[in-house]
């Protein structure tokens, strides 16, 4: 769901989806289901096609699942390896308190090269006041990479980590590390 304000669909409603757009992407990873769907109106996705790319890329089934951090009722960060590939997807969802993560990508294969695309809450994102604020960062990652990310209140982040198939994919990209 990319449209959080239900008043736009039903003017008499004051309902609100308690989530940021980045958190909605993360749910594709944190909540396992081999039957995924895009549950919003097509025109709402069309407004955010850069973020919709994550939904197009995310796998439906997994060879490996790892829970990188969690505190019940506060946050969860899961990493899942797409079945039959070397591609990984990470999702973090947080409560209304938000969450700061330090992610070590040491589960990646040291013999492979990867490109990560991070879909994260923007600095001013908030599930109540600015749920559609997000940033996208893309760069090269390895098992030595450490990323620091902040999930806004009611927010999260999603990361696709794709194995490099052709060195040309690396052109113009820099290493991702530190604060995202």
Identify the function of each model-found stretch.
Residues 1-42, 69-70, 120:
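Glycan-recognition surfaces
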Residues 3-7, 37-39, 46-48, 97-100, ...:
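Flexible loop/turn segments at secondary-structure boundaries
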Residues 43-89, 124-130:
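Glycan-recognition and catalytic regions of carbohydrate-active enzymes
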Residues 118-144:
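Solvent-exposed beta-strand/loop surfaces of large extracellular or lumenal domains
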Residues 34-45, 64-66, 102, 115:
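Acidic/polar loop patches that form or flank catalytic/metal-binding clefts of enzymes
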Residues 138-180:
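C-terminal beta-strand-rich structural cap/linker in extracellular carbohydrate-active enzymes
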Residues 30, 90, 154:
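Conserved, mostly hydrophobic/aromatic
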